[in-house]
Amino acid sequence: MKKLQQILNAKGAQLTEDGIIGSRTLTALDWYITNRINNNKWLRPKDGLVFLRTDTVFSNTFDDYCAVYKGGVCVAVVPCSTTAGDKYVFSPITHMGITGTAVAAEQQVIGSHHFVTNKKWSTLWLGAPYFQQIHAITIWRDGTRDRTMDRVNKQFGLFGINIHRGGVAAIVGSWSAGCMVIPDNHWFPITNNFVNGQIIDFTLLEI
């Protein structure tokens, strides 16, 4: 988490870059998110997730961040990936006549996802609770099959850009074709903050 602290310090925070996520780091993160949301004239989250994309590279790693909000308070931040893993970057699908892996654009969509869970996780998609896309969002479809994100082909719709577990490895691999994915050891604690059917917004900031 040192990288996040370095990013926040570059934006004006004064954090010790020790990789420890305490109240000062969460406060600084909330300050940054709130400023960006206000500048964009978006809605500040009450209960939900805010994704922070740190670069425009398909790194196949969890090098982005997800801030968790509960009751309007930023209660946690965890690593995530907001871009597809190598499987889909180098073997992209074709959708609506355009070949390319899906890359969610910076945006906020109100009520975009709902939480899906039950007592028997084995019956759930990917064997775990997840957030399912239920409203259209904007994506780029990148078909250049390299590690650089291109913003050429834009689409708007329901593409199954869900939010879910990202496995136990250090790489994204086949876990994401454009979904927001969070490593299992961070994902499962996050799910305790939500109930089945709960609706959240999709908020993605590029920093």
Where in this protein do the model-derived segments appear?
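Cell wall/extracellular polymer interaction/catalysis modules
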Residues: 21-173, 187-200, 205-207
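Short acidic, glycine/serine/threonine-rich helix-capping segments at coil-helix boundaries
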Residues: 1-32
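Short, well-ordered, aromatic-rich surface patches in folded extracellular/luminal domains
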Residues: 182
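Active-site neighborhood of thiol-dependent amide/isopeptide-bond enzymes
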Residues: 176
